Design a protein with these regions (language model features):
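Short alpha-helical elements
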Residues: 1-198
Length: 198
């Protein structure tokens, strides 16, 4: 696992264990997996929560049932216990109580705003970093498609856990990880000053 640098990204991804129409017949994960909903629709399985820094190194992870909320205090406190600095998240992590508890520990959570929320001023650096959240989405994609942590051929719960841990360990040993170049440059084009992140 990597170490916290003060810039952290968080996200969760779905891990289905079988097709929806087969969930009542699934005996391997009975009592473990649950039905949950993501942006892709309903599924039966688990949810993998990931934290990474701007260098693409995984900081922490947690596996929960699919019906557990991303903002669950127990899960979120365990995931973020060693963090400092800023935590960039999507709109699914908007919660006043979550913001307050993290702020008391010295972590500032930065999220986008929903359409039904009042506009608020955001630092230019934070706005640019929110657009760089694709780094954690890329990690999710690599874990699913390259390390193949998602498939429906598991024959036991221990096989599932070993496959998941092996995929995460394999990602930690990848030579090239996606990262963000944190150099800022002020460029002036036609009299307009602009801040650029490489």
């Amino acid at each position: 696992m990597g170490e916290c640098t003060g810039i952290t990204f968080i996200d969760s991804t779905r891990i289905p264990v079988c097709e929806n129409k087969r969930q009542s017949r699934n005996r391997v994960f009975k009592g473990y997996a649950q039905k949950g909903k993501s942006t892709m629709g309903w599924y039966y399985g688990f949810k993998l929560h990931l934290l990474c820094n701007e260098r693409g190194e995984l900081l922490n992870f947690a596996l929960t049932r699919a019906n557990v909320d991303d903002r669950s205090p127990k899960i979120f406190n365990d995931l973020t216990k060693d963090l400092f600095g800023k935590l960039y998240a999507d709109k699914g992590y908007i919660s006043q109580s979550l913001f307050a508890s993290l702020f008391d520990r010295g972590v500032y959570i930065v999220t986008g705003i929903r359409t039904n929320m009042k506009n608020r001023l955001m630092d230019v650096h934070d706005k640019i970093m929110l657009r760089k959240r694709s780094i954690i989405e890329t990690i999710n994609d690599m874990l699913k498609n390259v390390a193949q942590i998602v498939h429906t051929r598991h024959r036991s719960i221990s096989n599932f856990i070993v496959n998941l841990l092996a995929g995460i360990a394999a990602y930690a040993f990848y030579d090239t990880k996606h990262s963000i170049n944190m150099e800022f440059e002020r460029e002036e084009k036609q009299g307009v000053k602009q801040l650029t992140l490489f």
